[in-house]
Amino acid sequence: MTTVETVLGERFEVTTELGRIDLDVVHGWLSTDAFWAIGRSRETVELAARNSLNFGVVDQYGALRGYARVVTDQATFAWVCDVYVDPAARGKGLGLLLARTIVEQLRPLGLQRVVLSTLDAHGMYEKVGFIAMPEPQRWMLLAGPDVPGPGLD
């Protein structure tokens, strides 16, 4: 799937074709600048991408400007994660473009829940229909070894 949008006079494509998404760029972003993925290995980025629905924002010159992935069973549940926009392209609405495209792609699946975690983009996600978790006390987390606190170790 490829969607073409013009944002602030610039042409961008959102693609779900993994072959058009430069995972070296994604790895660079996530492993060095995304607080939730600092130090993530290139191998982990590739494995995660291969087992997810991927969304890449590509500019008119073919450069990757944004990325997100969705982990889903495509029947009841999806987790939106690793949402990242190139710092040089921020402020143009590319995060909103990614979020809107993801919602449009997931809606026909009839999922019961689509969840995500965000530190500072609540307002953007609300624009495409996300709400704060109504009963956060009902959710639990089994954290992995890189997450502070008790977990999988």
Question: What residue spans do the PLM features occupy?
Answer:
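Hydrophobic/basic alpha-helical segments enriched in Actinobacteria
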Residues: 15-20, 65, 96, 137
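Active-site-proximal cofactor/substrate-binding loop regions of enzyme domains
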Residues: 85, 99-102
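Conserved active-site alpha-helix within GNAT-family acetyltransferase domains
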Residues: 96, 108-114, 118-144
